[in-house]
């Protein structure tokens, strides 16, 4: 029984250490991506002080604003903050792919440019599937897939590799 308690204690210590190390790394990257996406400002992650509701609190201060909760941010600011957090996690713990569904919908053209540049930084380890209607995001893609419906109600899928399109334009040009 004593060995079981010792094992459980060791496991709890290891989990706490790994959580703390990972949280610190994600927090650091979150701040970096936040500043890049907002062209300034500050963001951080902190463990909750409330023992009855443990968790992680997100603090964000876009340039020219006070630090506050996500609820105080505009739709575009929330989208960029969430994107900064996701990209920070992917930088620390890469995933083979990530699907983003219209995360750029609330972004203006300048912010879409920062968003696509940030995605591009991680494409060496993570493949992004971005569902979008935003022309600037589409133009930043390597590969496009389009879905349309014909008159008979049948969906058609088209694909286009943008590098091939650019090469074809150069030959025709």
Residue ranges and their predicted role:
Residues 1-173:
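Terminal ABC-like ATPase head and other globular end-domains that cap long coiled-coil arms
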């Amino acid at each position: 029984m004593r060995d079981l308690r010792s094992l459980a204690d060791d496991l709890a210590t290891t989990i706490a250490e790994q959580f703390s190390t990972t949280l610190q790394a994600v927090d650091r990257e979150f701040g970096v991506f936040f500043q890049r996406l907002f062209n300034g400002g500050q963001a951080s992650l902190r463990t909750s002080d409330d023992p009855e509701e443990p968790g992680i609190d997100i603090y964000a201060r876009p340039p020219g604003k006070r630090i506050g909760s996500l609820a105080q941010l505009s739709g575009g600011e929330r989208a960029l903050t969430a994107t900064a957090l996701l990209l920070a996690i992917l930088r620390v713990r890469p995933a083979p792919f990530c699907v983003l569904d219209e995360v750029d919908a609330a972004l203006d053209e300048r912010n879409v440019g920062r968003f696509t540049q940030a995605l591009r930084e991680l494409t060496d380890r993570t493949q992004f599937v971005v569902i979008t209607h935003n022309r600037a995001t589409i133009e930043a893609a390597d590969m496009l897939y389009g879905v349309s419906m014909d008159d008979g109600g049948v969906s058609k899928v088209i694909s286009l590799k943008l590098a091939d399109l650019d090469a074809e334009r150069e030959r025709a040009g």
